[in-house]
Amino acid sequence: MNVKLIRIIVGAVLLAVAALVEHTVQLPVWQMLIIYLVPYMVVGYDVVGEAFEGICHGEVFDEDFLMFVATVGAMCIGFLPVAEPQFAEAVFVMLFFQMGELFEHYAEHRSRRSIRALMDIRPDTANVLRDGKIQTVSPDTIAVGETIIVKPGERVALDGEIVDGTSALNTVALTGESMPRDVHKGDQVVSGCVNISGVLTVKVQKSFGESTASKIISMVENASEKKSKSEAFITRFARVYTPIVVIVALVLAFVPPMFCGGYVEALTTWLYRALTFLVVSCPCALVISIPLSFFGGIGGASRHGILIKGASYIDALSELDTVVFDKTGTLTHGEFCVEAIHPDKISPDHLLHLAAHVERYSTHPIAVSLKQAFGNEADGCMVEDVEEIAGHGVRAVVNGHTVCVGNERMMDSVGAEWHKCHVVGTTVHVSIDGEYAGHIVVADRIKEDAADAIAGLHAMGISNTVMLTGDRKEVGEDVARRVGIDDCHTQLLPADKLGILEQLLDKKKKNRTLAFVGDGINDAPALARADVGVAMGALGSDAAIEAADVVLMDDKPSKMVTAIRIARRTLGIARQNVWFAIGVKVLVLLLAAVGLATMWMAVFADVGVMVLAVLNAMRTLRLSSD
């Protein structure tokens, strides 16, 4: 059982015994003081020690000092003429203060435990293949280059490449998505995924400490070091607020009695009010609940595959006015696919068949898209004399016919009269024996949720969405139009993108922020320059995790909407706590100043407000994406 809880229980029993003695035996005041000091010290010796330590180090004004002064003052008030002893009240105040502290520690521990459970993605053991035998060892003892075996139902312990086996991986702990990902030999796997079906043999590429799972856990746990504006405000507020409260309490204790008939009698009344004032003025609810709100928000976001590197970025996300997207790999897949087939005198299937066979040995992205669209090359077709002509295309003999696949220059070189295409994309022309046979349009495939993501941002009041791309003007503008982007800048070099970003930062509204969303590979300068740098699709990408302020672990632009929604709700809960705590405290402080609040009421108000604020803060752990 918790030591503090035992002290509280023992202190409560001793307080009851002391109260019983006080009401059954007539003892001098100093003897009753000694009796009540026993439960007081059992319950509050650490508070007294912290108060004295703070005084010795020059850090006088904190909650321990306020409680020490208020309770010792209540103990001593009974020695004033015509004053009633307040021993029981003093011990009870300390008892309740410690109960509040206990609840605070419990709530924080539970929050951290919940986050650790959510991020429990590192297995304690792994199966490593050594000397032809499978050994179960701790993952941190496995070196780069060794081979591990991942059985169905087990979690991948280290990042690596599959050298044997086929399976499906559950990546929900990393990406927040429940759809399994199919993997086979040659694919990369990252630690934290759960193997669903087949046995996988994986060659380790990163040590345990450098694995994706370890970096994610470290990032979430260290996120609290970067304080939000609200946290920084509360820290400054407490430093100024507490000394002011002590000064007001001193004035309240000693100035009003000067204007009363009997100074000593009035001093007793006003001193009690001042001590009550001190008890209720303790800023625990604010100091505890605000950081807990942001910590919970960061943990809650991690459940959805969103890693926020600090509470300050929750502030920045909630104040976004402009979101800038890189096109390739962010709004589009970065992979070509066939958009249209326009044959001339032959069938569409035959046109695609010829293009795919001519390009069958090429690794160019356009060639890959043609082969994927055709799907089946094992049809007995004879392909000979394949020649790649730089800057033009590929020429080959297919079943005795010379087939050219390439751009307009290729068609001009063989005398084929080609046609322009109205479909936006890269046009691949085809000729057969010098006669034009048609063209195929390939384009970078837009992500399925890109349009929904932009619509979601607009619905949240983000007034400016911008896309940056190095693509041709017509290609970039077509993508922007299809997804609903407000502004598009095309034909940009990497250095140009940073210049555009600087212009947008200069134009943004005051007290609003700008986010840049990229794939984290070539966007490090832009990610660093934006108010919030967001790396998308960073599963297994060290560069993205290091460079960005916010990391979206999968490839869905809609996760940006989720990140902003969670940030705004987290900030809303933190603000609720601020206004609730300040409102209740101001009310009870006023009641204490005019003598309408007792010390019992004050401690109930202080601890009660803290408990409610902490419970409200813990809601951030379960924020949904909707």
Q: Model regions: which residues?
A:
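Juxtamembrane helix-loop transition segments at the membrane interface in multi-pass membrane proteins
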Residues: 52-61, 103-117, 292-311, 618-626
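P-type ATPase nucleotide-binding
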Residues: 338-464, 473, 482-501
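Conserved ATP-binding TGD loop and adjacent catalytic N/P-domain core of P-type ATPases
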Residues: 400, 432-576
